[in-house]
Amino acid sequence: MKKRALIVLAALVLASCTSRKPASPPAPIEPVPPPVTVSVQPPPPATSEPVPMPPKIKTIDWQASLSPLVQQMLAVEGINDGSVLLVNTMKNTTNGSVQTGKATAALTRLITDAGGKFQVVGANQLNAARQMLGLSADDSLESRSKAVGLARYLNAQYVLYSAAAGDVKQPTLDLQLMLVQTGEIIWSGNGVAQD
């Protein structure tokens, strides 16, 4: 029995061995001829149309446009000298793009240069407060209530809310001075932006 098992095992081992086929001769290596270089002439440049000029951005003289309104606001009686004022970012409700950052900066500069009527909240302090309250510096949904809330956070007595409205070529400027404690509008003025 052991002999048979041994013979069967040997037969299986031998059957599983494959015999090698005779190796075929290696394929002959043929040299590749060098590539033929063909000089290609670049196509003549296509005549291109001139690039159209971008539309000119209408520049507004913010100093001249806002100065009369600021003078009217500074003439309001009942405001203590040195009161803290938050100049809110100008809101754009025109039919186009208005440089509200420049307008707000000009408005702040006019009030600061006017003397000691108001102590204007600085830009760094304003930006820090906006971050703390989760408001974006470029908040397109700016509202009077947000402006008053921001002013309360900064302990300002007054807020100057401003907006540019109408046609972007000559927007109407609306300014409102609000008492933070009550939200009451104590002065408002409007004018047309000048070139």
From Swiss-Prot:
Gene3D superfamilies: ABC-type transport auxiliary lipoprotein component. A lipid is attached at residue 17 (S-diacylglycerol cysteine). Disulfide bonds: none annotated. GO terms for biological process: peptidoglycan biosynthetic process; regulation of cell shape. A lipid is attached at residue 17 (N-palmitoyl cysteine). It holds the Pfam family LpoB. GO terms for cellular component: periplasmic side of cell outer membrane. Residues 23-51 have a biased composition (Pro residues). It comes from the Bacteria. Residues 1-16 form the signal peptide. Residues 19-51 are annotated as: Disordered. It is a lipid-anchor. It is found in: Cell outer membrane. Regulator of peptidoglycan synthesis that is essential for the function of penicillin-binding protein 1B (PBP1b). Interacts with PBP1b. This is Penicillin-binding protein activator LpoB. It comes from Sodalis glossinidius (strain morsitans). The lineage of its organism: Bacteria, Pseudomonadati, Pseudomonadota, Gammaproteobacteria, Enterobacterales.
